[in-house]
Amino acid sequence: MLDDLALFAVPPRELPLVAAVFVLAAAFIFGALWGSFLNVVIARVPRGQSVVTPRSRCPKCETMITARDNIPILSWLLLRAKCRHCGAGISARYPMVELIGGVAGTVAVARFGVTLPAAELFCFILILVAISFIDLDTFRVPTGLVVALSAVGLGFGLLRWQLLGPEASGGLAGDDVVDRLIGGVVAGIMLSCIVIVATGVLRRVKDKDGNPRVPPGEWAMGWGDPMILAALGFCLGWQAMPLTLFLASVIGSVIGIVLKATGQLKDRGPISDDDPWIPPDDAVPFGPFLALGGVLAAFFGDAIHARLLPLLGLGDGGVLLRYLE
């Protein structure tokens, strides 16, 4: 029996084709189901509602969604993106999040098999997805999910260290739990300092109307962003933090410039009926870019680092970062 169970700890690429397809398909379905739950989290957490009860309902006619209409991805396709009862449109975000969940499950199992590192990677991606969409919707970072992400990093690190010893490797941050602790603390302090300095500078910079770019009482960046970077530090270790912040800043700047140039940041109106705050015309949530930077660093950190250092004139790029091994 134990030998049969151990089979699933083997990466699918080392299994016979039929077994590999079965394991990966099961991982995709499992991930898509969690993606469906993630949609509930994204919709309810900002409102302070329970993610367990009541059951999901159509937001327009409030008819309870039955099991046959709640099959990840498939139900949305079969219903042609409309509620079965009232015909109201169903956002493409729902199947997109479910697809992301399925891909996350597949990638985690493909890389590690059914193991603790796979569970760690899966939880890491899904929590970042939830944080990102909530930040996009509300310009607010959900503290509870940031705490959960920190717990994933430290919890899995400690668990693997207890089970496999101090020489354990193969997780998101190599083999040292101390690296994760340092990463979380240093990353949070680092970005907090950047927020303070940027705020001081931008309060002295005037816009076209002669007003400070950052009015008194406001900050250049939300304080949820340092919390996200700290949580990423607890997951990836301190070595990954400079690259994570660099990637997030570059990608965020490029996308922000494109959105502003195309006029997509204007006339956005209030965040919601419950939150009358209207984002400035040049405001773009930074949380999703931090999340993307963290995922890119986790998967491609060594490769990016090895190519980036020579471009910056800092040597041959040797393997200085430790991510997925």
For the regions a protein language model found, what residue spans apply to each?
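A membrane-topology feature that recognizes alpha-helical transmembrane segments
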Residues: 1-325
